[in-house]
A protein has these predicted regions:
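General structural feature for long, well-ordered alpha-helical segments within catalytic domains
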Residues: 10, 21-28, 41-52, 80, ...
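Non-cysteine beta-strand/loop elements that form the S-adenosyl-L-methionine
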Residues: 83-85, 200, 407-410
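Acidic/His- and Gly-rich active-site-bordering loop/insert found
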Residues: 10-113, 118, 122-143
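Conserved short loop/turn motifs at secondary-structure junctions
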Residues: 37-38, 147-151, 300-305
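Histidine/acidic-residue-rich, glycine-tolerant segments that coordinate divalent metal ions
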Residues: 69, 91-93, 100-112, 118-119, ...
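Divalent metal-coordination and catalytic microenvironments
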Residues: 32, 73, 84, 117, ...
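Metal-dependent amide/peptide-bond hydrolase catalytic core
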Residues: 221-490
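Short, Lys/Arg-enriched N-terminal segments with co-localized hydrophobic residues
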Residues: 1-8
Length: 490
């Protein structure tokens, strides 16, 4: 039997520790912003996070599941075991001067934290530090594990970790993501596979002896044409994207002996992605057969659909509401206003999307009343029905292993588009720092709710069991597939 007073005291202990250690967390976030390392190359960023974990008394293990930059920091003993997920990879080609209200590239072609993962990883670390303090002070049984999860951007790092059993023993997992709005996520996302199709032909003089050539590029184009016809005959929520990554050279007078295309196949469930994948493979093989070329199918990565746990999401939402949004300085609001207005009319889209999914008219009106604000300081209404995202996240693979929930917290100006120079510019600002501390406290608070009241985890597990309906986790990544850094030869 838990006592509410103990829960509130425990939260205050954690929140005070988070405030006390905020300076070192801001330093770590800003340093990771400066490293801006892309998927599976995050060695410096990993060291920054691991150094803080070691200094705070966590037991650190690296190279989890044979993923070089995957790690964890553990504190405590016994049940429940709660995981806090952190990310720290950047995006290629998004270098940007910090604090600027216009696009200013400092190092052309360099990477940048256009998705705010410098904040994501450090806020989760801050939450783990707060939880550790609570466990020490309360003397209660329980374990907190901070997971350093690399390669979220295009690498599905957590899926590789899940394949290695990294999350199998967790009772619950919590994470968050930076954004322009604050809300508890109750929705789902699409599972996906990323696959390279490599066509091998035979070169020849395109004018003098075209009959001797077998064009790999012809095969690739025929494959793409076949997939275009397939699109009508898959589930409506499916998405099939592609990028031609090698056309066989720059000489039109040569029959191209090699060509390559990268496909990203999405659908609501892993089984649907697998079905579409097999059909795409047949199209690729048919294209090769038509052109007397050869195709090699190279599976790059995959991730599962997200199953947001509404029981834990509600705990996150309650803590976000209890804490309330940060207060910003006049200078910070001036900066936010310049960024938000610079986005243009599209800055209202995220707000309007939230309002559209409010069933209660009063709640919808309340959300829309914030239109025109430079920084959204309200918590979006809790939506138990959830909204399907047509994107994908490797948090999905964690959610198939244990009850998992995530929050979105405002860390940048209203309407800021993700994966943009505007996100990078705001990544070291007061907006970012205050938002990540808000997120850290909400995650720590939700975790303490679960340590103090075992019934919460019991209900979360019951919800997950009902959602699975007898299904079990099967990692979408096949045996032998290894994580690949961006730009690594396929």
């Amino acid at each position: 039997m838990y006592r509410k007073g103990d829960m509130e005291m425990g939260k205050q202990t954690a929140w005070e520790e988070i405030d006390k250690k905020s300076s070192e967390i801001f330093t770590a976030s800003d340093e990771i912003w400066g490293c801006a390392e892309t998927a599976f190359t995050e060695d410096k960023s990993m060291k920054i996070l691991c150094d803080v974990l070691k200094a705070e008394g966590f037991t650190v293990d690296t190279g989890l599941a044979d993923v070089k930059t995957a790690f964890k920091g553990t504190f405590g003993s016994g049940k429940p075991v709660i995981g806090i997920l952190g990310e720290f990879d950047a995006l290629s080609g998004l270098d940007q001067e910090a604090g600027a209200t216009e696009k200013i590239v400092v190092h052309d072609g360099a990477s940048g934290h256009g998705c705010g993962h410098n904040m994501l990883g450090t806020a989760s670390l801050s939450a783990a530090i707060g939880i550790k303090k609570y466990l020490e002070e309360s003397g209660k049984p329980g374990t907190v594990i901070y997971f350093g999860c690399p390669g979220e951007e295009g690498g599905s790092g957590k899926a590789f970790m899940a394949k290695g059993g990294v999350f199998a023993d967790l009772d619950a997992a919590i994470t968050w993501h930076p954004g322009d709005l604050t809300q508890a996520d109750t929705g789902s996302s699409l599972a996906n596979y990323q696959v390279a199709y490599k066509f091998y032909g035979k070169s020849a003089h395109a004018g003098g002896a075209p009959h001797l050539g077998r064009s790999a590029l012809d095969a690739l184009e025929l494959m793409n044409m076949g997939v275009q016809f397939l699109r009508e005959h898959v589930v409506p929520e499916a998405r099939i994207h592609y990028a031609i990554t090698n056309t066989g050279g720059y000489s039109p007078n040569v029959v191209q002996p090699y060509a390559e295309v990268l496909y990203l196949i999405r659908a609501p469930k892993n089984s649907q992605v697998e079905e579409i994948y097999q059909r795409v493979n047949k199209i690729a093989e048919g294209a090769a057969h038509m052109t007397e070329t050869r195709v090699e199918i190279d599976f790059v990565k995959g991730c599962s659909n997200l199953m947001s746990n509404k029981v834990i999401a509600k705990e996150l939402w309650d803590n976000l509401v209890e804490l309330g949004a940060p207060e910003y300085t006049e200078e910070e609001m001036k900066f936010a206003k310049a960024i938000s207005e610079g986005v243009g009319d599209s800055r209202f889209e995220s707000l309007e999307k939230i309002a559209k999914n409010c069933k209660d008219k009063a709640a919808k009106a309340e959300v829309l009343s914030h239109k025109g604000e430079s920084m959204y300081r309200f918590v979006a209404p809790f939506n138990p029905d959830g909204i399907m995202s047509f994107g994908s996240t490797d948090v999905g693979d964690v959610s198939w292993n244990c009850p998992t929930a995530q929050a979105y917290v405002a860390t940048w100006a209203a309407g800021t588009p993700g994966h943009s120079w505007q996100v990078v510019s705001q990544g070291k600002s007061g907006l970012a720092h205050k938002g990540l501390i808000y997120a850290a406290k909400a995650m720590a608070g939700a975790a303490i709710d679960m340590y103090e009241d075992p019934e919460i985890i019991a209900k979360a597990k019951a919800e997950m069991e009902e959602e699975l309906d007898g299904d079990t986790y099967h990692c979408p990544i096949p045996d032998g597939c290894k994580p690949r850094a961006i730009g690594m030869k396929m």
